[in-house]
Structure formats: structure tokens, C-alpha cells
Swiss-Prot record:
Key words of the record: Cytoplasm, Heme biosynthesis, Metal-binding, Oxidoreductase, Porphyrin biosynthesis
Any one of the GO CC terms: cytoplasm
Site residues by UniProt (Important for dimerization): 175
UniProt GO molecular function: coproporphyrinogen oxidase activity; metal ion binding; protein homodimerization activity
Organism domain of life: Bacteria
Functional note: Involved in the heme biosynthesis. Catalyzes the aerobic oxidative decarboxylation of propionate groups of rings A and B of coproporphyrinogen-III to yield the vinyl groups in protoporphyrinogen-IX.
Protein name per Swiss-Prot or TrEMBL: Oxygen-dependent coproporphyrinogen-III oxidase
PROSITE patterns per record: COPROGEN_OXIDASE
One matching Pfam family: Coprogen_oxidas
Gene Ontology annotations of biological process type: protoporphyrinogen IX biosynthetic process
Amino acid sequence: MSDFDRVRDYLTALQDRICNVVETIDGQSHFHEDHWQRTEGGGGRTRLLRDGAVFEQAAIGFSDVCGTHLPPSASVRRPELAGANWRACGVSLVFHPKNPFVPTTHLNVRYFRAEREGKQVAAWFGGGFDLTPFYPFDEDVVHWHRVARDLCAPFGDERYAAHKRWCDEYFVLRHRNETRGVGGLFFDDLDKDFERDFDYQRAVGDGFLDAYFPIVTRRHDTPYGDRERAFQLYRRGRYVEFNLLFDRGTLFGLQSGGRAESILISLPPLVRWEYGYHPLPGSAEARLADYLLPRDWLEESRICE
């Protein structure tokens, strides 16, 4: 079996596993699957759960697509590959829970290969996961980062710190001067050793289940009202802004002639903007600002213990 097929098989199995966990936790709605083909080459399967007891919308897609000219968003860090033939596979998800006390989350794990004249000239892994709470709990944020640190540990003492920092630097709304959430892990251009890099991708994909779903279980029954719901929808606007303005995966998909329905499925089903909004000083809504900047969550928790 080729390296690409090994990655592909892992990713399709990961999509299945995550969907099973989501349906079990939600207990009400089920994923609907849409198989699609891309005219330029390849295809995928998009799964969407809507109007659940826990998840307002949970979208998770697998794609295996190819093309003849590497788009600018993929070659900006590798200009020597501009115009090369390419093939990419990946799993990407965004979950928008119903309860404002359950964070939104994102996971992406992908593998990319470039060819010239039928020969592979480059291949690399990328991905990561991040967490976007609206009413954050320190316990949840520390748990999230502990799982991230622990899954990184077999890959060197610097792996967690480096990929956490990369996440903090990537998921930034520069026009708002705030991060998208409390971070996590982000990596790209991982190409030193296929087996080791593939092990890391699997650790990230598998670790996501351990990082996110305990938080969902803890928070999805938390009482909330109209005020919390309105703030959730307002903050979702920031999520939309990042995805449309800065997200590399979104830009790559659109620039490569990808399937817009699948690319934009990450956007929340309901969202609102409000001109000149400022939360009341000292309120739970105002407290969120303290979380939307890079912080060493594990060191802070150690000091507080």
C-alpha cells in the first residue's frame, strides 16, 4: 500500500470514529452523508448533523482531491512548487454546539503531495486543533492543553511549545487584535520523516477525541438564557470573519476550484453582528477578553496549584 493510501485509510476511519462519538453524545440527530466528485479530479464525503440536542451543527468532511497547478495559497511557503501537479487528502471538522457554555471547536489533519513529470517532488503533513469558548472555564482550557502536551511528548520536548505557539500565531484576527480562541496545536510543512510525521498526525487526530468530548460532556447541560445565546451568536461572527479572511484551508479550497458547499460548511448556521458592541464591565461576557490572547495555560495552572 502506498504512503498516500495509508494516510487516506486512517483519515476515513478517523471521520467514522468521530461521527460515532458525536451521535452518541447528541442522542437525537444523525449525520447525513453527501458523496461528491470534483470535475478537476478527486472527491470526498461530507457529513453534517443539524439541530441536535447538543450540536446545533456538526460538520466533518473527508476529501481526496488532485489538480494540475498548485494554487497560490499552497505554494506561498514553497514557491519552487508553483504550478506543480498535486494531490491532497484530509479531514476537517467544525462543531457548533447549541449551548453557549460548550466551546466551538475545529480539527484539521491533512497530507499533501506534489509531482512533476509523474515523480513526487514534495510531500508533507499539516493540521491541528483549536478551541473557541464563549464562556470559558479554566478547567476546560487546562484539560485541552494537557491533552495537547501529552500527545506531543513522544515527539520531543519542544513539540508542544512550538506547535502551541504556531497555533497562537495562526488563529489571530489581526483586524480585531484578538485570537480566535484559547489555541491548541497547529503545524504545517511536516516533511522530515514520513513514519514519524504520520505517527504525529495520528496522535493529533486521536488526541482530539480525548481533548474535546470530555468538555462537551461536562458543559452541555449548563443552564443558559437569551443573554448567553445572543452573545454566542455575536461571537460566532468572529469565527466567520477568520474563516473568510485568513483561513488557509478555506482560501486553498476556493482558489483550487473546490466544492464551495463543503468548504463553507464550517460557517455557523446562525450568527449576528452588532455595531459598537461592548460587554458590561465585570460581566461574564467581558471576561472572555482575558482568554483571547496567547497564554501559557499549563504554567499558569501549575503556579495556582
